[in-house]
From Swiss-Prot:
InterPro entries: AAA+_ATPase (IPR003593), AAA_lid_4 (IPR041445), DNA_helicase_Holl-junc_RuvB (IPR004605), P-loop_NTPase (IPR027417), RuvB-like_N (IPR008824), RuvB_C (IPR008823), WH-like_DNA-bd_sf (IPR036388), WH_DNA-bd_sf (IPR036390). It comes from Leifsonia xyli subsp. xyli (strain CTCB07). The gene is ruvB. This is Holliday junction branch migration complex subunit RuvB. DNA binds at residues 313, 318. Residues 1-185 are annotated as: Large ATPase domain (RuvB-L). Belongs to the RuvB family. Keywords: ATP-binding, Cytoplasm, DNA damage, DNA recombination, DNA repair, DNA-binding, Hydrolase, Nucleotide-binding.
Length: 347
C-alpha cells in the first residue's frame, strides 16, 4: 500500500487496463450512459450549486464495483469546473493522513475517497467536523498537556464511494447531502456503452456482436469495456471480422460463458454444489474452499449470482438455487435447496 493518502489502491487493475478505461470515461453527465435517475439528481445538485456560487453538497455513491462511481466523481469535478483530488480509504490509516490531505485542498476542490468505508476510525471522526464546518482540530502534545488547535479548511466537496454502505457509521453517512445507489445496467444500456467505446476505439463491430457482449458482462460497464477489448484483440490477431462468431470464440477462450459466469463464479458455485451439497455454507468457509478473499466473494461474485437467480443468501449461509443445479446439468436434492433469497448474511 502506498504511504501517500492521495494515491488510491489499484491492486486488481493493471496500468494498461486503467489507461484503457480512462480513455473511455465520459467527461460530462450528458455523455454518461445509464443511471438516469442519479444523473438527473446530480445535474440538479450541481446546477443549483453553480447558480448560488457555492461548493456542491457532499456526495456518497454506493453500489457494486465497476458501475461508474469514480467516473461520476470525475464528472462532478469537471462540471463544477474544479480540480479533483483522488484518494482511497485504505490509504488513510491515521488522522494525520487525513489532516494533511484536507489542509492542502484549494477552495472548491472536489475530494474523491474511494472505498471510504475502509478509512481508519480516527480519520472518520476527524472527517465529521471537516464536512460540517470546514475545519479540523489538531491535537498538539500528549497526555494531560495535550491541547486542541482548530484549523480552518478551504470549502470543498467530498465525493465518497463505497461498495458496502452498511459499514459506514451513521454519523458519517448523515453528513452527505446527497446519497445515490448505482444499479446494475440492463443489456440495452450496456449495448450503448459498448457502441460508444467501439466508436472511440475506431473498432468496427456489428450490432449483433455488441448485443452478445452486452449479455455476458454481468450488468457492469467496466466488464463490458474489458470484454470488448478482448474481442478486439481476438479479431486483430486472427485477421477476421468482429462478428458474433468472433465474440463466441474470444469469450470462450477467456472462460466467460453465455450467462457471463467467469472462472471464479463457477468455482464458487461448484464448491457449493459439490463440496457442500448445495449449502448452506458460510462466507469464510466458502472463501477458503476457492482460495479467494471473503470480501471479493461478497462484493464482486455474490451480487451477480444472486441477481441472476443462481445463489441465495440465507440466515444459515449461502445456498445454491434449483437454477444453479440445472445450469450445471445436475439433479437438485429434494429438500432445502430452493429457499427464497434473503438479504441476511451469515457471520
Amino acid at each position: 500500500m502506498s504511504d501517500d493518502p492521495t494515491t488510491p489502491e489499484l491492486e486488481s487493475e493493471s496500468e494498461s487496463e486503467l489507461a484503457f478505461e480512462g480513455a473511455l470515461r465520459p467527461r460530462t453527465l450528458a455523455e454518461f450512459v445509464g443511471q438516469a435517475k442519479v444523473r438527473g439528481q446530480l445535474q440538479l445538485l450541481l446546477t443549483a450549486a453553480r447558480m448560488q456560487e457555492r461548493t456542491a453538497d457532499h456526495i456518497l455513491l454506493a453500489g457494486p464495483p465497476g458501475l461508474g462511481k469514480t467516473t461520476l466523481a470525475m464528472i462532478v469535478a469537471h462540471e463544477s469546473d474544479r480540480p479533483l483530488r483522488l484518494s482511497s480509504g485504505p490509504a488513510i490509516q491515521h488522522a494525520g493522513d487525513l489532516a494533511a490531505l484536507l489542509s492542502s485542498l484549494t477552495p472548491g476542490e472536489v475530494l474523491f475517497i474511494d472505498e471510504i468505508h475502509r478509512m481508519a476510525r480516527t480519520a472518520e471522526e476527524m472527517l465529521y467536523l471537516a464536512m460540517e464546518d470546514f475545519r479540523i482540530d489538531i491535537m498538539v502534545g500528549k497526555g494531560a498537556g495535550a491541547t486542541s488547535i482548530p484549523l480552518d479548511l478551504a470549502p470543498f466537496t467530498l465525493v465518497g464511494a463505497t461498495t458496502r454502505s452498511g459499514l459506514l457509521p451513521n454519523p458519517l453517512r448523515d453528513r452527505f447531502g446527497f446519497t445515490a445507489h448505482l444499479e446494475f445496467y440492463d443489456e440495452g444500456e450496456l449495448a450503448q456503452v459498448l457502441a460508444r467505446a467501439a466508436v472511440m476505439l475506431e473498432f468496427e463491430i456489428d450490432g449483433e456482436a455488441l448485443a452478445e457482449i452486452a449479455g455476458r458482462c454481468r450488468g457492469t460497464p467496466r466488464i463490458a469495456n474489458r470484454l470488448l477489448r478482448r474481442v478486439r484483440d481476438y479479431a486483430l490477431v486472427h485477421g477476421g471480422r468482429a462478428d458474433i462468431a468472433a465474440v463466441h470464440a474470444a469469450l470462450e477462450l477467456y472462460d466467460v460463458n453465455e450467462l457471463g459466469l467467469d472462472r471464479l463464479d463457477r468455482a464458487v458455485l461448484h464448491a457449493i454444489l459439490e463440496r457442500f451439497e448445495g449449502g448452506p455454507v458460510g462466507l469464510n468457509t466458502l472463501a477458503v474452499s476457492v482460495g479467494e478473499e471473503p470480501e471479493t466473494i461478497e462484493s464482486v461474485v455474490e451480487p451477480f449470482l444472486v441477481r441472476i437467480g443462481l445463489l441465495s443468501r440465507t440466515p444459515r449461509g449461502r445456498v445454491a438455487t434449483v437454477a444453479a443445479w440445472r445450469h450445471f446439468g445436475l439433479a437438485a436434492p429434494r429438500q432445502g435447496h430452493s429457499q427464497p433469497p434473503s438479504l441476511m448474511d451469515d457471520l
